Amino acid sequence: MRHAPCVVMLVHDMSTDRYLIEREYRAGSDMFAYGLPAGLMDEGEDIMDAALRELAEETGVVPDRDTMGVDFVGDFYSSEGMTDELAHIMVLHLGPFRREQRHFDADEHVESAWIPWNDLAATRITSSNSMIAIQHEALRRLIARNSDKDKPSLFS
């Protein structure tokens, strides 16, 4: 199945150490599911421009690009046996940001909330693309928190 590429982003508010999570109806699994901000790229659109556009449309969050850190996790096929959809996955570490009006597609309704890391790590998320970003951040946190400690812990 032919499919446009997409962007998936784990969004981290550095000032509060909270993460942005979404809940929306997913037709493919016929259920409401938790996940991360994501969306299809427009033809010819730059990856970062697409990520920031989707983030603003779904959540109203508009980061300051000059103070935002980006960890590009990688490019992964969503299901290479079924589709050519390539997911560009990243973690955005936000400094200051502003809020704008959200703009949903006609068939889209997304709820979003900022939650602490422990809550995110405990949330049942079934999207593999979202889990790739979350696992990447878990490793980053593990390395950062335990660089001078004897015992690693993902929950500190």
Q: In which residue ranges do the predicted regions lie?
A:
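Acidic, metal-coordinating catalytic segment for phosphate/diphosphate chemistry
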Residues: 1-15
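Glycine/small-residue-rich phosphate/adenosyl-binding loop
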Residues: 19-22
